[in-house]
UniProtKB/Swiss-Prot annotation:
This is MD-2-related lipid-recognition protein ROSY1. The gene is ROSY1. Disruption phenotype: No visible phenotype under normal growth conditions, but mutant plants exhibit decreased root basipetal auxin transport, faster root gravitropic response and increase in salt stress tolerance. GO terms for molecular function: phosphatidylethanolamine binding; sterol binding. PANTHER family: MD-2-RELATED LIPID-RECOGNITION PROTEIN ROSY1, NIEMANN PICK TYPE C2 PROTEIN NPC2-RELATED. It comes from Arabidopsis thaliana.
């Protein structure tokens, strides 16, 4: 049984339509010319898009070429366009076991939005950076867009 050119073209178009959803959001480094010690290979948002009735979780997968010890901070900044909305800071050791040996690393940031943040925008630019405070060294910095869906309750808007 031979597959026609039309069927191959249709299969290609369908795979192109669904492949971005399978790969997670497009992300980029904050400074495209810089080689960070922690190289990010993927970013996943769950659920994608984030539902206003729930919350979102970000999972970052990558590889570090150096040991990361205690005292490192993970910063998550939310912005609408280029206008900052909020900043959250986490100790790396609260997110993953420390010290982190060179090699693969997975970071998961749960509950990334406050109730107010879920109400006020249809999407956010998120900037996540990891900084070694004692050395003042940026170990990773990425940015990407997260979309929100669903309707915010008017009662919640009045009472919060």
């Amino acid at each position: 049984m031979a597959i026609s050119h039309t069927q191959l073209l249709l299969l290609l178009l369908v795979s192109l339509f669904f492949s971005p959803a399978l790969c997670g959001p497009k992300f980029q480094t904050c400074d495209t010319g810089k080689e960070y010690p922690l190289k990010v290979s993927s970013v996943e948002i769950s659920p994608d898009p984030v539902k206003r009735s729930g919350n979102g979780e970000i999972t970052i997968t990558g590889v570090t070429n150096k040991e990361i010890s205690d005292g490192v901070t993970v910063n998550l900044k939310l912005a609408v366009g280029m206008f900052p909305v909020s900043t959250k800071s986490y100790s790396l050791c609260d997110i993953t076991a420390c010290p982190v040996a060179p090699g693969p690393i997975v970071l998961t940031l749960p509950n990334i939005f406050t109730p107010r943040e879920k109400r006020t925008a249809i999407g956010y630019t998120i900037i996540i950076s990891i900084t070694d405070k004692p050395l003042k060294e940026s170990m990773m910095c990425i940015l990407f867009v997260v979309k929100l869906t669903g309707h915010a309750s008017m009662i919640n808007q009045v009472t919060e």
